[in-house]
Amino acid sequence: MSSSAGNQVRASHILIKHQGSRRKASWKDPEGQIIRNTTRDSAVSQLKALRDDILSGKAKFDDLAARYSDCSSAKRGGDLGPFGRNQMQKPFEEATFALKVGEMSDIVDTDSGVHIIKRTG
């Protein structure tokens, strides 16, 4: 049985972890030195600047994800692959399912940190 289009999405994201993140380490900061010293406000400011660069055409989403995201998906340009309901944290899932393909979210907060999400499928 194939899943209908409404049950699965595909997305890429850029995650910036901060002091309030559940896990204060990442592939690019294994000891969490930077993350422990990053406030949520500064993480949001960084993400907003990246989002502005993408929207203005100055940079590509996948290039910025590869460079700045604290998620290991950075190695794939932020691509998380396809996922369905109840597979991601609720705020992340709701934001992704609300986007149209090709659209990018505003800032989304989860226990992992702050994200911008681009729905790709």
Swiss-Prot record:
InterPro entries assigned to the protein according to its UniProt record, in alphabetical order: PPIase_dom_sf (IPR046357), PPIase_Pin1 (IPR051370), PPIase_PpiC (IPR000297), PPIase_PpiC_CS (IPR023058)
Biased composition regions of type Basic residues, renumbered to the chain: 15-25
Species of the source: Malus domestica (Apple)
Top-level EC class as recorded in UniProt: isomerase
PROSITE patterns in the record: PPIC_PPIASE_1, PPIC_PPIASE_2
Documented EC number(s): 5.2.1.8
Family of this protein: Belongs to the PpiC/parvulin rotamase family.
Domain PpiC: 6-121
Highest taxon above the source species: Eukaryota
Activity regulation, free text: Inhibited in vitro by juglone.
The keyword DNA-binding appears for this protein: no
Note: Like all plant Pin1-type PPIases, do not contain the N-terminal WW domain found in other eukaryotic parvulins, but contains a four-amino acid insertion next to the phospho-specific recognition site of the active site. These extra amino acids may be important for mediating the substrate interaction of plant enzymes.
Bias type Polar residues, positions: 1-10
GO cellular component: cytosol; nucleus
Reactions catalysed: [protein]-peptidylproline (omega=180) = [protein]-peptidylproline (omega=0)
GO molecular function terms noted in the UniProt entry: peptidyl-prolyl cis-trans isomerase activity
UniProt keyword terms in alphabetical order: Isomerase, Rotamase
Protein name: Peptidyl-prolyl cis-trans isomerase Pin1
Pfam families linked: Rotamase (PF00639)
Coiled coil (residue ranges): none
